[in-house]
Amino acid sequence: MNVAEFHQNIDQLWDSIEEQLEAQDADADCDRQGSVFTITFDDRSQIVVNKQEPLLELWLASRLGGLHFAWKNNDWVNGQGVRFWDALTEACQAHGEQVSFI
């Protein structure tokens, strides 16, 4: 994946997060600022998803800690084989929001 594809992929992922949260009536607000995507919950807690362009990685920070994901076999996966969508679902649940992502 080149840098342009990386940014396009992440932008599509961020769009999908917003759409899926909306579709599930989640009590969360999404905000994009440059390379950072923030999900803020009613209690003001946050999940932060950011682009790491030099590494072509996607990082996720939440109450559960921080995870790094690389693009492998058409999916964002961390070093332990956890899919980004599964980690995001778990992170949202840790913030009190019962949602699931594809």
Swiss-Prot record:
Alphabetical keyword list: Iron, Metal-binding
SUPFAM superfamilies, per the entry: Frataxin/Nqo15-like (SSF55387)
Top-level taxon of origin: Bacteria
InterPro entries the UniProt entry points to: CyaY, Frataxin/CyaY, Frataxin/CyaY_sf, Frataxin_CS
GO MF term (any one): ferric iron binding
GO CC annotation terms, alphabetical: cytosol
GO biological process per UniProt: iron-sulfur cluster assembly
Functional description taken from the UniProt entry: Involved in iron-sulfur (Fe-S) cluster assembly. May act as a regulator of Fe-S biogenesis.
Family: Belongs to the frataxin family.
Protein name, per record: Iron-sulfur cluster assembly protein CyaY
Organism: Actinobacillus succinogenes (strain ATCC 55618 / DSM 22257 / CCUG 43843 / 130Z)
Taxonomic placement: Bacteria, Pseudomonadati, Pseudomonadota, Gammaproteobacteria, Pasteurellales
